[in-house]
A protein has these predicted regions:
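Structural signature of nuclease core domains in nucleic-acid processing machines
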Residues: 1-167
């Protein structure tokens, strides 16, 4: 993989490019090491079909699921836009099969440092189907006009509130 990246020609020339490629490889390996213990069970898929009301349904397949856990890994620095691809399927699982002990783990690079950042998502405090309805309403609104609060700003505000800081 390292040689392929080098041959692709996207890295700086000489030793600088080689060092950069090795740094990228080390960071990717750290992410893989963090995710591997969470993926020990065989991956499976769950077909969901959730009635949202007003003639709308959410249907699809959530995968891969390891035990009762979604594991989402990204090379990007973990942020709000990386949590949504795990959170929305987690809501779908909780709405479709509320008796399940569903969870999700999101792994990505940290904002600072080298240790991978991990966020665990569990059962929502609010009924999952209600949250899915809210997301559909936001989707509908976004198809008509700009959304009132951008994702990065919303995530920063929520993190500050949860962390007890002044947003």
């Amino acid at each position: 993989a390292l040689r392929a990246e080098w041959c692709r020609g996207t890295l700086p020339p000489g030793q600088l490019g080689w060092r950069k490629a090795k740094d990228i490889l080390e960071q990717a390996a750290a992410l893989a090491r963090e995710a591997l213990p969470l993926r020990t069970e065989a991956a499976r898929a769950v077909d969901v079909d959730v009635e949202l009301g007003a003639g709308r349904r959410l249907t699809g397949t959530v995968s891969p699921i390891f035990g009762n856990r979604l594991v989402w890994t990204t090379y990007s620095k973990l942020d709000g836009k990386h949590l949504l691809p795990a959170w929305i399927p987690l809501l779908a699982l909780n709405a479709f099969a509320p008796e399940g002990d569903w969870s999700a783990v999101c792994i990505g690079r940290p904002k600072r440092g080298a240790q991978p950042r991990t966020r665990r998502l569990g059962r929502p405090d609010t009924a999952a189907v209600d949250l899915l309805r809210d997301l559909v309403a936001i989707y509908d609104l976004g198809r008509r006009e700009p959304l009132p609060l951008p994702l990065k700003t919303s995530y920063a505000y929520a993190e500050a509130r949860i962390g007890g800081k002044d947003p």
